[in-house]
Every structure is written in structure tokens, then in C-alpha cells.
Amino acid sequence: MTDLPGRRLLLVHAHPDDESINNGVTMARYAAEGAHVTLVTCTLGERGEVIPPALAHLSGAALGGHRRGELADAMRALGVDDFRLLGGPGRYADSGMLGLSDNDDPGCLWQADVDAAAALLVDVIREVRPQVLVTYDPNGGYGHPDHIQAHRIAMRAAELAAEAGCPVAKVYWNRVPRSRVEDAFARLRDDLPGLPFEKAAGVEDVPGVVDDERITTEIRGEGTAYAAAKAAAMRAHATQITVAEPYFVLSNDLAQPILTTEYYELVRGERGGEGRENDLFAGIAGTFDTGEATS
């Protein structure tokens, strides 16, 4: 790839929809600012539960193909042109929830050799030369096998890429500060009677919640076009998500807030100043900051 923009962001996710829920504001912001945003999705989510009755017939490869189309629609909403499947379509299958027999499928991501899968991601890193990599924490946010493997693959790829002379300057994990999500759920409980959802999720249902002091970086989107783009991207994943702003449900039908500020923990690289960063590229030589770190 030639003529790369000055800022290059790589995100690694397990299934279509994970990127929009976790990073929709972030992706929309950096795409709009002219950064090169690359999304690598590890599986097509063929074993996901389908919400709309009209699409309930979809399963397996048919569901995977449909979700690939949803992903393309979501990327259009976010303004992202570079989105790929790890190893190409069908290379790795959805593993299903932990403890199911699906985990034993030799073609699923859970059974993948991490070094072999990471080598495929290194090829992407060598091509796009990202300064920033975003993925999950070691538990994958909430313990799904594909999320755990996506974390392992991304972190191993960062190591291998550095050994190959293509280091990634900063690596972040998706996080949510406990105080923020507690406040959001308090508002949700007040709003629930007026919503098309019967029950609310709890703080324990939100992936990646940590104590506030673990948060190093926040990307704000309240009241911006980036927040609107995130909601539109989430709506595009209609088999998996029902949106009633500022809330949504997954197939468990438990309402939770759409987070229009997205939070991160820097786990590799140098922090860009004191206090919380508000730019993933803060402090990286050869890029420009769009804001100062805040307390």
C-alpha cells in the first residue's frame, strides 16, 4: 500500500457488530479526520443468535454471508473503506459460546493455532503500518472464545510484527470505567418504562468494565456526528442488535446504554502526556494530536 496517511489505526475484532458497539465513535472520528482505519474481523459470526423473526431462518454459512453484508453497511455508516476478514472469508468459523460443542469444531477460531493466525495479521500490519492497535483484554471483554482468541492473535501479531521491523507504537484494550456505566444504568432504569424493551441488563453484563483509574484514554462523541454514525452502524447489524437510542439490546433482550464516549487502557507504548488522553495517537512521533490530554 502506497501513499499512506500520517495516522493509521488497526482494530481487531471477533465478529461483525463488535466493532460498532465498542469502537463506532472512534472509527468514525478517525476516518473523518483522514486517518487510515483498518478493521480486521476474525469470523463472520455464523453461530450468532438472530433477533428479527423475518431473518430467523438464517444460520451457518447463510447467516455468515448475511452478516458480512451487515458489516459492509456498518462500515459505510462509519466512513471506513478498509475492512477485512482474517485470512479471507471462511478461514475461521465462529466458535460459539464457551462450553458448547461448537468449540471443538477444528475450523473454528477457538481451535486456531495462534501463531499461524497471528502471521496472517502480521501481513496486514506490514501492509498498512498502523501506529495504533485496538483489541480486547485477555478475557475478551466477557469470556467469549472468539474474543479471547482475537486478543491472543492481536497481541501475538504485535510481537511478531515488531520482530519483523514493523513495530506498533501503541496497543490499547477496549475498556469501560465503572462509574460511567453505573451512571448510565441508573438513567436506563429511570427510562425503561418508556422504552420498547422490558428488562435492563446490569453492569456485570457490559464487557471490559474496570475501575476508573485503569482508563488511560477516552474518545468523546456525545452530540456529534460520530455518535450518530455509531448508532447507524449498530442498526446495520440488524440480525444482532435492536437500537432505540440511546439504548440497545442484543439477542438476550436486555437493554443497555449506547456509550458515545469510548474508553481504552493503554497496555503498550508511551502515554501522550498527563491525565487521560483524548487521542489514540497522542505522543506518537510523526503524527499530530487533535487534542490535549485531560485530567
Curated annotation (Swiss-Prot):
EC numbers for this chain: 3.5.1.103
Necessary cofactors: Zn(2+)
InterPro entries, A to Z: GlcNAc_PI_deacetylase-related (IPR003737), LmbE-like_dom_sf (IPR024078), Mycothiol_biosynthesis_MshB (IPR017810)
The UniProt record lists the keyword Transcription: no
Biological processes annotated in GO: mycothiol biosynthetic process
Catalytic activity entry: 1D-myo-inositol 2-acetamido-2-deoxy-alpha-D-glucopyranoside + H2O = 1D-myo-inositol 2-amino-2-deoxy-alpha-D-glucopyranoside + acetate
Cofactor annotation remark: Binds 1 zinc ion per subunit.
List of residues binding Zn(2+): 15, 18, 147
EC top class named in words: hydrolase
Key words of the record: Hydrolase, Metal-binding, Zinc
Hydrolase among keywords: yes
NCBIfam families, per database record: mycothiol_MshB (TIGR03445)
Functional description taken from the UniProt entry: Catalyzes the deacetylation of 1D-myo-inositol 2-acetamido-2-deoxy-alpha-D-glucopyranoside (GlcNAc-Ins) in the mycothiol biosynthesis pathway.
Similarity comment: Belongs to the MshB deacetylase family.
HAMAP family associated with the record: MshB (MF_01696)
Name this protein carries in UniProt: 1D-myo-inositol 2-acetamido-2-deoxy-alpha-D-glucopyranoside deacetylase
Species of origin: Streptomyces coelicolor (strain ATCC BAA-471 / A3(2) / M145)
